[in-house]
Amino acid sequence: MFLDKSRVKPEIILRKNDLITPAVTSLENICKMARISEDMESTTVGGFVFILRPYSSNSIFSIYLLEALCSPTLVEHIKSITNKSGQAFYNIGKERLATVLIPLPPIAEQQKINTIIEELFQKL
């Protein structure tokens, strides 16, 4: 679907380092996320997708945040705070998502963690 830019809120245009995740999904798809690697000036998301926009535009932080949010511990925690919405869907409210605590080591440590995880994925 194409809309004139004047009809699109600037805050929903995808930017480099944004993370996107479904707001309403099946339980097994909770925390399925993607990181936006470059500005996408003509791309937005729909109403059932969250944009998680890190306060820092640093790629190291964005990659670390994605890895942390997809870790088994945080996935299980986020699953535990979702609401069932209908027969088969779960809803992650912004208010509940905002309560998730994520450990944030210094940026140099985040880089080391990112590198180790990337090396492990290359071995798969």
Language model: regions and residue ranges:
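Short, ligand-facing micro-motifs at secondary-structure edges
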Residues: M1, L19-G46, I63, E67, ...
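Alpha-helix N-cap/helix-initiation motif
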Residues: L3-S6, N58, E67
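Amphipathic alpha-helical coiled-coil/heptad-repeat segments
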Residues: S71, V75-E76, R96-L124
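A short glycine-rich beta-alpha junction/loop motif
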Residues: S42-F50, K84-P105
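Sequence-specific dsDNA recognition surfaces
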Residues: M1-L19
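Short, conserved charged micro-motifs
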Residues: N58-I63, Q111
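Extended, Lys/Arg-rich, non-catalytic nucleic-acid recognition/anchoring regions
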Residues: P54
